[in-house]
């Protein structure tokens, strides 16, 4: 079989195997993503496999550069890719996309044993908090809220409901009053 026929057969098999699986995503007929782990799992990661023109005789391109993997350190990513590359070399010449995804699912805990989540929000807040002491003493002025009297507060509370929203229909026009002002066509 030619490489193109092998790819078509594997593509058909992947579509039937992963039909309805939310973790699997077909980016193009030669590029696939699979999320290993659940959505909220801090040890979840995303693998992208792209086939070359001569795949499966040549190895596919493996990638973990997806935005989903931003919390994973580059050392852990390199470790995962190295282990997947070993599996690629063992399966060279055969359809291996499903095998690689399953291998990653089976070895997820081993792959992520050295994983310490990088929290980008924490690192940004650390940068901000480092810069804040320099600017904080110079701006001690606080913005004052508008002070309302009791009567103003009561009037505002009467207009709004318990959520602070205006009631439904507060700007509706009284139909009878409106029509009496405009008159009918017979009056002209």
Swiss-Prot record:
Q: Would I find Acetylation among this entry's keywords?
A: yes
- Tell me the InterPro entries matching this sequence: RWD_dom, RWDD4, UBQ-conjugating_enzyme/RWD
Q: Which UniProt keywords apply?
A: Acetylation
Residues carrying N-acetylserine? 2
Q: Give the matching CDD domains.
A: RWD-RWDD4
Q: Compositional bias of type Basic and acidic residues: which residue ranges?
A: 155-166
Q: Which PROSITE patterns match?
A: RWD
Q: Where is this region: Disordered?
A: 132-167
Keyword Cell membrane among UniProt keywords: no
Pfam families documented for this protein: RWD
Annotated ranges, domain RWD: 9-111
What is this protein's name?
Answer: RWD domain-containing protein 4
Whose protein is this, by species? Answer: Homo sapiens (Human)
Question: Gene of origin?
Answer: RWDD4
């Amino acid at each position: 079989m030619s490489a193109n026929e092998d790819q078509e057969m594997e593509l058909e098999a992947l579509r039937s195997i992963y039909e309805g699986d939310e973790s699997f995503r077909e980016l193009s007929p030669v590029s696939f993503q699979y999320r290993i782990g659940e959505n909220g799992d801090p040890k979840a990661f995303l693998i992208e496999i792209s086939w070359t023109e001569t795949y499966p005789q040549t190895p596919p391109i493996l990638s973990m550069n997806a935005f989903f993997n931003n919390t994973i350190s580059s050392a852990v990513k390199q470790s995962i890719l190295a282990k997947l590359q070993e599996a690629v070399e063992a399966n060279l010449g055969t359809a291996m996309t499903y095998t690689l995804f399953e291998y990653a699912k089976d070895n997820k805990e081993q792959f992520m044993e050295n994983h310490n989540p990088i929290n980008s929000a924490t690192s940004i807040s650390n940068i901000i908090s480092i810069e804040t002491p320099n600017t904080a003493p110079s701006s001690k002025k606080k913005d004052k809220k508008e002070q309302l009297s009791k009567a103003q507060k009561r009037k505002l509370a009467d207009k709004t409901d318990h959520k602070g929203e205006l009631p439904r229909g507060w700007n509706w026009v009284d139909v009878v009053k409106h029509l009496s002002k405009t008159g009918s066509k017979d009056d002209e």
